Amino acid sequence: GPNIHQILTTISSKAVCNIGEIIDLNIKNNNQPIKIFWCQLSIDKALIISWYNTNELISLLNNYLKPQTNLINMTFGYTALSLIGPLNTQLLSKLTDINLNANLFTSKNCRTVKLAEIYTILLNFNLKSLSNYILLVETSYGEYLWNTLISLGNEFNIKPLGYSGYN
């Protein structure tokens, strides 16, 4: 909502996040820092990513909200896919007209795009030295996008990697 900047500055007085950027923040909970990633999608929408317990995080974030600001848990409404590797930009370029040049869409950037005609939240979020895109799509489109990526990815020798592969 319109008070999204107020939430960000309440969480961290020094935090500034422009549209399309992803920043790391620590929220204190009983003097324990909770790491979140704040992804500013538009002037009035942000995506918060964390590996912390969802219900506890929502409860904690609600402490920062004014009555007219809404926090919506979209965890179960989206499928997350990750494309890791040196050819991922080439593969994604087959599915969108958006320029994904690394100089224009750097790591720790986000935007909404159409991939294979599907509204997608695209995060460029490198893992150490590995190029990594995280794709968030409505759950009902997850399997379709997965199959499209695997099919088009054959020329790039794409391989499925389970969650354990992140470690």
Predicted stretch roles:
Residues G1-N167:
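Basic, glycine/lysine-rich polyanion-binding surfaces/domains
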